[in-house]
Each structure stands twice: as C-alpha cells, then as structure tokens.
A protein has these predicted regions:
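Short secondary-structure boundary micro-motifs
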Residues: 11-12, 32-34
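Autoinhibitory propeptides
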Residues: 1-10, 14-16
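Compositionally biased, intrinsically disordered low-complexity regions enriched in proline and serine
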Residues: 10-11, 59, 115
Length: 120
C-alpha cells in the first residue's frame, strides 16, 4: 500500500496522509451493479436496479464492483496492499448498464433521479 500511494501521491497526497478517508460520505456508483465484495461489506447502503428491476444486489459484468473498489474498497481482502481513495465511504449502488456494459439513456436518467430523490 505504501509503495502504491507513494507512486501516485502527486494527485492524491491527502489520501496518502490519511486526511481524506470518506468517513461520513455516501457516494453513488451508477454502473453495471455491484457485488458483496469483502472490501465493501457493511458499506453498501442502497441499491437500485434500473435495468432488470431485481431487488437483490448483483453485478453481471464486474465493472461496477471494480469502480466501487477503486472508490471505497478498504483493502482488507488484500491484506491492506490496495485500498480505494475513500476507504471509509459508503456506497449507493445503482445498476444502469447491462451485462455487456452498454445501456439506455433512460436507465441512466432514472438512476440519477433515484439517487437525487434518496439524498433528500
């Protein structure tokens, strides 16, 4: 983790010094969905599937889970070697893209609307 952060410190020096952790922040990830990854457990606070309407959280592509990990993974499953930029942030996951990573503008708009309504 130290080597990785040292190499990218020029654009994330605050995260390198652990000043920004994401604590108290809820981030929306509008993508292919999200899985219950060990590095995200307990911090997925919302779910909406705008593509198929499923109630159970899932990611049939993997991209959304990857993005969520870059954003807020805590690194526990990798023994701390890799963590996201805001490892204490909570995630509101919205599936707006299909299994192939494509989607409809309508689903993206509905996902954005849903997040905006939930924040109020």
């Amino acid at each position: 983790m130290k080597d990785l952060k040292r190499k990218i410190h020029y654009w994330c020096s605050d995260t390198m010094r652990n000043k920004i952790t994401g604590k108290g922040v809820v981030c929306a990830v509008l993508d292919t969905g999200i899985t219950q990854h060990p590095d995200l457990v307990g911090r997925i606070v919302g779910w909406k599937d705008c593509v198929q309407g499923k109630k159970t959280i899932y990611d049939d592509n993997g991209h959304g889970t990857h993005v969520a990990g870059i954003l807020a993974g805590n690194g526990k499953s990798g023994r701390g070697l890799y963590s996201g930029m805001a490892p204490e942030a909570q995630i509101f996951a919205v599936k707006v893209l299909n299994q192939r990573g494509g989607g409809k503008i309508r689903d993206v708009i509905n996902g954005i609307r849903y997040v905006l309504l939930k924040q109020k």
